[in-house]
C-alpha cells in the first residue's frame, strides 16, 4: 500500500483533500499527522475521558454489578487495563499469550483479582503510559505488519489492534458510566456541557 512521507495512504490523502475542497475540513486539520501520531493523540484523548469516569468510582461501588453474571464496576476497571496490556503485547511484541488464554478459557482466566479503587486506577495509568511509550517507539513502517495465530484464527494488522484498544476502552467506559448513573452518580460536568 503506497504511503506518503507522513505515512498516510493514497486513499486517506484523497479523502482529506476531497472534504477540504468542499469546506468540511478546516485548512490544516490533521494534515501533518501520520497514523502513529493519530493513535497517540487519540489514545490520550480517550484516556482523559476515562479518567473522568473512573475517578467517580467509590470503594463501596467496586463490587456492584447490575445483575448476576455481569462484570462488577471493579472488574470493568481492571478489564480495561488488563486487555490493553494484552493487546499492546500482541501488536507491538507479537506476543499473543493473552489471547491464547483469553479466547479458549474466557475473561475470568486473564482478569485476576480486583484490587482497591486506587490500585486499579494506578494500573490504568501505568499500562496507559507503557502503551504510549511502546507505540511511540514502534517504527511507523511496521504498523501494517500482521499478527497471525492460525490456531485462534487471528490475523490482524498492528495498527488495527492498537486502534482497537481505544475503541474497547470507550465501550467499557460507557458501560462503567451507565453503572454509575444507575447508582445515582451525576453526569460529569465536562460531559453535561456538551
PLM regions and their residue ranges:
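Short, contiguous alpha-helical
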Residues: 40-51, 59-106, 146-194
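Short, Lys/Arg-enriched N-terminal segments with co-localized hydrophobic residues
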Residues: 18-32
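Hydrophobic alpha-helical core bundles mediating ligand binding, dimerization, or RNAP-core interactions
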Residues: 43, 47, 54, 124, ...
Amino acid at each position: 500500500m503506497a504511503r506518503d512521507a507522513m505515512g498516510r495512504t493514497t486513499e486517506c490523502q484523497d479523502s482529506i483533500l476531497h472534504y477540504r475542497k468542499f469546506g468540511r475540513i478546516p485548512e490544516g486539520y490533521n494534515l501533518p499527522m501520520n497514523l502513529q501520531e493519530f493513535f497517540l493523540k487519540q489514545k490520550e484523548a480517550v484516556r482523559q475521558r476515562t479518567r473522568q469516569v473512573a475517578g467517580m468510582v467509590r470503594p463501596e461501588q467496586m463490587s456492584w454489578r447490575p445483575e448476576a453474571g455481569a462484570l462488577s464496576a471493579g472488574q470493568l476497571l481492571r478489564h480495561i487495563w488488563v486487555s490493553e496490556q494484552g493487546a499492546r503485547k500482541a501488536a507491538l511484541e507479537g506476543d499473543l499469550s493473552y489471547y491464547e488464554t483469553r479466547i479458549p478459557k474466557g475473561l475470568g482466566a486473564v482478569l485476576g483479582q480486583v484490587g482497591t479503587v486506587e490500585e486499579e486506577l494506578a494500573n490504568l495509568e501505568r499500562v496507559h503510559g507503557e502503551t504510549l511509550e511502546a507505540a511511540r517507539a514502534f517504527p511507523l513502517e511496521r504498523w501494517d505488519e500482521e499478527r497471525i495465530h492460525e490456531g485462534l484464527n487471528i490475523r490482524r494488522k498492528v495498527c488495527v489492534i492498537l486502534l482497537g484498544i481505544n475503541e474497547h476502552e470507550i465501550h467499557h467506559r460507557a458501560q462503567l458510566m451507565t453503572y454509575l448513573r444507575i447508582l445515582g452518580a451525576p453526569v460529569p460536568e465536562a460531559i453535561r456541557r456538551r
